[in-house]
Amino acid sequence: PLLAARRLLGAELIGRGVTAAIVEVEAYGGPADGPWPDAASHSFRGAGGRNLVMFGPPGHLYTYRSHGIHVCANVVCGFDGVAGAVLLRAAVVRTGADVAGRRRGPAILPAALARGPGNLCSALGITMEDNGIDLFDADSPVRLTLGEPVPSVDGPRVGVSKAADRRWRLWLADSSEVSAYRRSPRAPAPGASD
């Protein structure tokens, strides 16, 4: 997952009239018995229900609702049958800022159009109905185009209570679109075992 996360930084996400370059991601592994055990992952307890897409082929979109409200998008990155995904946390809108602005609201500054996972999905028109689509299929409503690898900074993931110190959040250091870091109040103290 971490290799895939690095590869997704700088990639272009194209969806419903908006093109955005990905500037922040978080990697998530899979079940306890898999190659990348990750207690913070939706797939940690195994395949079932909403997380089945995470066990499917790589390059597909896994969507879920955060706190029952915000749609969040992940790129599946494990090989078929092995869970892994990369959460798309933030992007800079390159084209279609007017469309993204209508979706997000008139008071939103350009740098904030796709800052944060829920805002990114809102700006690009990604919904729960997009769960499972192939991001590399030219006919998909949301597509991904990889670019050249870019230098990144890493740090702990945002808002997770398990595996909170894992440095699987990556971002472009010079981007004003990167979201703020917030540690989960339920996470153990930094450096403590979880």
From Swiss-Prot:
Intrachain S-S bonds: none
Keywords for this protein: DNA damage, DNA repair, Hydrolase
One Pfam family matching this protein: Pur_DNA_glyco
InterPro entries attached to this UniProt entry: Formyl_transferase-like_C_sf, MPG, MPG_sf
Signal peptide interval: none
EC code(s) of this entry: 3.2.2.-
Gene Ontology biological process terms, A to Z: base-excision repair
GO molecular function: alkylbase DNA N-glycosylase activity; DNA binding
Main EC class the enzyme belongs to: hydrolase
Top-level division of the source organism's lineage: Bacteria
Family assignment from sequence similarity: Belongs to the DNA glycosylase MPG family.
Database matches in PANTHER family: DNA-3-METHYLADENINE GLYCOSYLASE
Name of the protein in question: Putative 3-methyladenine DNA glycosylase
Species, as recorded: Mycolicibacterium fortuitum (Mycobacterium fortuitum)
